[in-house]
Amino acid sequence: MRYDPSLIEKKWQEFWKEHKSFEADEASDKPKYYVLDMFPYPSGAGLHVGHLIGYTATDIVARYKRAKGYAVLHPMGWDSFGLPAEQYAVRTGTHPRETTQKNIENFRKQLSAMGFSYDEGREFATSDPDYYRWTQKLFLFLYEKGLAYMADMAVNYCPELGTVLSNEEVENGLSVEGGYPVERRMLRQWILRITAYSDQLLEGLEDLDWPENVKQLQRNWIGKSEGALVRFEVNNERFLEVFTTRPDTIGGVSFLVVAPEHPEVNRLISENQREAVESYIRAAQSKSERDRISETKVKTGVFTGTYAKHPVTGADIPIWISDYVILGYGSGVVMGVPAHDERDREFAEAFSLPIYEVLDKDECCIHSNHGDFLLDGLAGQEARDYVIAYLQKKNLGEAKVAYKLRDWLFSRQRYWGEPIPIIHFEDGTCRPLEDDELPLLPPEIQDYRPEGFGQGPLAKVKEWVDIHDTKTNRRGRRETHTMPQWAGSCWYYLRFCDAHNSQAPWSNENERYWMPVDLYIGGAEHAVLHLLYSRFWHRVFYEAGMVSTAEPFKKLINQGLVLATSYRIPGKGYVYPEDAREDNGVWMSASGEELEVRQEKMSKSKLNGVDPQILIDEFGADALRMYAMFSGPLDKNKLWSNQGVSGCRRFLNRFYEMATSASVQDVDDPKGMALAHRLVHRVGEDIEKMSLNTIPSSFMEFINEFVKLDIYPRSALAMVVQALAPIAPHISEELWTVLGYAPGIDAAGWPKVDPKYLEDTSVTFVIQVNGKLRARLDMDKATSKEDVLSLAREAVAKYLEGKEVKKEVFVPNRLVNFVL
C-alpha cells in the first residue's frame, strides 16, 4: 500500500472534528492535565514553521496524557487586540475587526492542517465582546480593590505610534513594536498597583518548575533591595528623603542628585538657577528612561542653587539635578558617594565635586567619625545597622526595603483595545460601570489616528464620549483611553476552564478542577511582560478567594528560537532566498549585489520564514511534526532544514510499507515484542522528561531492527503505532485501522509495558585464544552454549587454523577461551 498523507491527513482531521475527539470534560472522574500554549497574536503574516515548535510539543503531551487516562484540557485562542491591526487601519481605513477576523481564519486553517488536538469548542478571541466584557469586569474588580488608579506621571510616549508605552515595551530608546523613537512626557494615566504584590510575586517564584533564567529575570525586574531611608534637611523647613543600600557610606556623601521629575524640584530651585534648571528638565523629558540610565552615557546635570544639611555632620551638601536618577526607584533622590560608586564618581568628576574615601580595601569604615557618631572600624551589616540606629534615634532615618518594580502603566491611546469602563464627572469624581452596562463597546469610527498628545482616537467621537449618565442623572465623559494588549492575556487561561459561562468569567467548580496549568509553553520574550502581569492578576484573585491556586502556571518551558538562513544586501535590506545564488563561494542577489549570509531567527522582516503549508503539501503534516521535534532540544535554538522534513517523510514511507506488508501476522515473536516494549517504554520516558527530540531517533532505530524479522507480529506493531500517535497522529490512526482496530487510537490508551521485556537480553562475550583477547561477540542471553562456541570458533578461526584445541573454557554470558 502507498502512503499518501494528503488523503490520510484530511480523512482523520474530519474524523476528529466529527467525533469531537478532543473535547475536554471537567465532569470526568479522571485525573486532569491542563496543557497550554501562549496563544498567538493573529498577524497578517500568518504562522511560519518556527511558531510550530511549541505547538507541536504541547500537542504531543496532550495526546500522550489522553492515552494515559487523563482528562486533558488543550485549548487554543487568539490574543487579538493589538497595535498592528490598528496601524493597518490607519493606513487603509479597514476596521481592525475585519483584518483580525481574516487573520484568525488563516491561523485556524494553518493549525488545523497540522492536526493539533485542540478543544475547538473553547476557542475565543480577546477582542470578542463576550470575552472582554469579563476583562472589563476584572479591571473594575482591581479598581474597587484600590489596585487601579489615575495619576500624572512621566511616561514613555511614542509620537509615531501615538500612544504611551510601558517600560517593558521600550528597548534602547525605541518602541519594541516598530522600533520608533520614544520620548518622556508627563501625562495622566491609568496605573495598576503591581508594587503592592512585590513580595508575593518574589516568594511565589520559589516553588515554580520554571527555567531558572526566567525566574531570575523576574527577581531582577522586581529588584528587592534592603537598606535605609535617610532624611536630609533643606532650608530648615522640609526634608529630602534618600533610599540607599549602603548607609555605611554616609560619611562620604558630598552631594545629592534629584530626578528631574521629582515633585520637590520646583521648591529646590534658587531664582538665579531657575532658567538653567528648567531648560535642563525640558531636555531630560525628551529622553527615554533607558537612554538616561545607560552606563555609557556621559553624565549631565545642573545645580539647583540650594543645599541640604548632612544628617551626621551638619555640613552643607549641594543639591543637583541629573537625568541619570529616575523617580520611580527608591525615592528619586541619590546621595552622591563618589569614592565608592562609579556613577557618582563620573558625576563628581564631571562637575569637580569633592570625593571622600570612607571605606578601606576591606570595606571597613574609615574617616567617618563625628562627635558621638562612631562608625570607624565597623564593617558590613554591623556598620549598616549602626548607621540606621543612629539616624532613627535622631528621627533622620530608618531601615527600609525598596523595589525596582514600578506600578504598571495600564492605559493606551489606541482604538483597538478594551475600552476602560469608567465615566468621569466635572467635579473630578468618576463612576465604574455596573454589570448591566458591560461590555462597553467602542464606537464605529473612520479615522483611527490618535487625537493629539495624550488623546486616543476615541476622544474624537464626541457623541460617544460626552453622555448623560442615566444612573446618576449627571453629565459625564467616558474614559477615552483603552487597555493594553496584555489585559486580555492576563487571565485567558482561566476563561478556557469555562469558556461559555455567561454569568461569570469562570465557575469555581471548573477552576478548581482544571487549575493550575500543568504545562505552559511559549517564548522567553514574555518573561517580564505577560508572565509577570498574569501572575499579578492571579495573585489578586487568589487572595480574594476567586481562584484555588496561588500561581497560574505550574511548569513553564520556553521553546528555543528557530533559525534559518537570511540573505541581506548590506545597507539596503533583506532579499528572498529564491533571489540569492552562489557564485564561486560568494552569494549574490538577482541584481548582482554581494549578499551577507547569516543564520538568524526566522521572521517575516528577514524574509526567511518558511510557510508550513508548503511543507505540508510536499511532505505531509506528520513529517513536519516529526522534524519539528527532531530538529533539536525543545528549549534550545535550532537551525531549520527542509531536507530534515524530507528525511522524516522517508521514514514514514518506510514505516507505512512495513506496517501494511504481508509480513504482518498474528504470531508471538519474543524478539519483536521485546523491541516494541522497549520502544514504548523509551518514548513514554522521553515525553515525561520533555526530551522530545530523541523520540524520532528511537523509532528509526526500532524499524532498522524490526525489519530484520522474518515475520512482523501484529500486536507488537500495534503497540508501536500507539506510541507513534502523539508525534505523527494521522498515519497512526490510519495504520491502527489497517491493523484491524476500531478508529480512534487515543481511546485505546497507552500500551502497557511488560517489565520482562525491558531486561537487557543481549550479552557481550569476550573470545580469547590462550588467554589473549582476539574478538568480542554480542548475542542474545538465551543463545545455547553450543551455538556460542560455534560462533566463537568462527570469530577466531584464523588463530585456530592448523592447531589443536586442547580445552574450551566457557563462562556463561561472559567469556570463551580456547586453550591450544
Curated annotation (Swiss-Prot):
Highest taxon in the source lineage: Bacteria
Catalysed reactions, as listed in the record: tRNA(Leu) + L-leucine + ATP = L-leucyl-tRNA(Leu) + AMP + diphosphate
Residue span of motif 'HIGH' region: 40-51
Enzyme Commission code: 6.1.1.4
Enzyme's top EC category: ligase
Pfam families the record matches: Anticodon_1 (PF08264), tRNA-synt_1 (PF00133), tRNA-synt_1_2 (PF13603), tRNA-synt_1g (PF09334)
An example Gene Ontology CC term for this record: cytosol
Record-level GO BP terms: leucyl-tRNA aminoacylation
Compartments where located: Cytoplasm
SUPFAM superfamilies: Anticodon-binding domain of a subclass of class I aminoacyl-tRNA synthetases, Nucleotidylyl transferase, ValRS/IleRS/LeuRS editing domain
Motif, 'KMSKS' region: chain positions: 601-605
Binding site residues for ATP: K604
A GO term for molecular function: aminoacyl-tRNA deacylase activity
The entry's keywords: Aminoacyl-tRNA synthetase, ATP-binding, Cytoplasm, Ligase, Nucleotide-binding, Protein biosynthesis
Family statement drawn from the similarity comment of this UniProt entry: Belongs to the class-I aminoacyl-tRNA synthetase family.
NCBIfam families: leuS_bact
Protein name as annotated: Leucine--tRNA ligase
Natural source organism: Chlamydia caviae (strain ATCC VR-813 / DSM 19441 / 03DC25 / GPIC)
